[in-house]
Amino acid sequence: MTIIRKKHPLIKIINHAFIDLPAPSNISSWWNFGSLLGLCLIIQILTGLFLAMHYTSDTATAFSSVTHICRDVNYGWLIRYMHANGASMFFICLFLHVGRGIYYGSYNMIETWNMGIMLLFAVMATAFMGYVLPWGQMSFWGATVITNLLSAIPYIGTTLVEWIWGGFSVDKATLTRFFAFHFILPFIIVAMVLVHLLFLHETGSNNPSGLNSDADKIPFHPYYTIKDLLGALLLLMGLMILVLFFPDILGDPDNYTPANPLNTPPHIKPEWYFLFAYAILRSIPNKLGGVLALILSILVLALMPFLHTSKQQGLTFRPITQTMYWILVADLLILTWIGGQPVEYPFIMIGQVASIAYFTIIVILMPIAGMIENIILDLE
């Protein structure tokens, strides 16, 4: 068996990635989220595949087909809610994974980090298009509002929007192409994940101490395979509690009303995992400015390797930057809350302050804190 594992051209790749991989001996549970994201992706692709077997991407029948899945297909309700809530679990793991990367300075592995940012964009695009497919009120109006943002691009904006819509409004052509993209993107994401792993295995994993762990490595299997299995069980337990007891807690009631272009819902808002970005978008009065801020809210992560001023990698022994980090986390929670609130006083003001704070902490305060800590710890 050992010979096959180490010699076979295909199995050898799996062996080097998941079995004989030298891993740091001290990586904590924060390093579990990579494998959990892999599990989420598998769940989403499988449930999505079974949903696609019964779904019809036509404005006349899309809403009915989703109802049909929930009522008439064997365990269709289970598949549908696993897919919908699986997306939420996916984003929870994504945010924790990125948060871990920021906390422990993993962004210094630039190729892996940039690939991760591209993955984040791809997953967000996929989730957005998936939300349009049930063709409820929030699906339709969410698609209308978000695609309409592209009209802010000078000169080509309006043409671009009509090209994406396939007409002069969100209609049958839009739904069909969104279904096509929503189906193909996860497979592109799988390919990107493999590249992400390829880059990671060039450098090896970071660890909580932020020190080089070459002198103290252990094999990935059995130590981390069993640890990942425990994480997977906890994730599945959380997902199934959500699916079986509170399937609609994260959804919008408006999406149980079929799409109606003549009736605008009082509060148009995306799924909870986009609310922080939506709040940043809304906090800028200018349309193009809002769109740029929206893109920058994620793209600012790409600047982190260049804003790293500290002589230490992680925040483990850096109390000032640690404080900044947790203020940033609180700020993101505030933005998420604001994104779901109506556009009125005092929410507008809170959103603007929180948006400014978000960029200020990342671009200005954390690098300054790093420099101060170098001086305090006499590392200059």
From Swiss-Prot:
Keyword line: Electron transport, Heme, Iron, Membrane, Metal-binding, Mitochondrion, Mitochondrion inner membrane, Respiratory chain, Transmembrane, Transmembrane helix, Transport, Ubiquinone
InterPro entries: Cyt_b/b6_C, Cyt_b/b6_C_sf, Cyt_b/b6_N, Cytb/b6-like_sf, Cytochrome_b, Cytochrome_b_C_euk/bac, Cytochrome_b_N_euk/bac, Di-haem_cyt_TM
Xref: SUPFAM superfamilies: a domain/subunit of cytochrome bc1 complex (Ubiquinol-cytochrome c reductase), Transmembrane di-heme cytochromes
Single GO term (MF): metal ion binding
Free-text comment on the cofactor: Binds 2 heme b groups non-covalently.
Residues reported to bind a ubiquinone: 201
Transmembrane feature ranges: 33-53, 77-98, 113-133, 178-198, 226-246, 288-308, 320-340, 347-367
Entry binding sites for heme b b566: 97, 196
Protein known as: Cytochrome b
Record organism: Phenacomys intermedius (Western heather vole)
Lineage, opening ranks: Eukaryota, Metazoa, Chordata, Craniata, Vertebrata
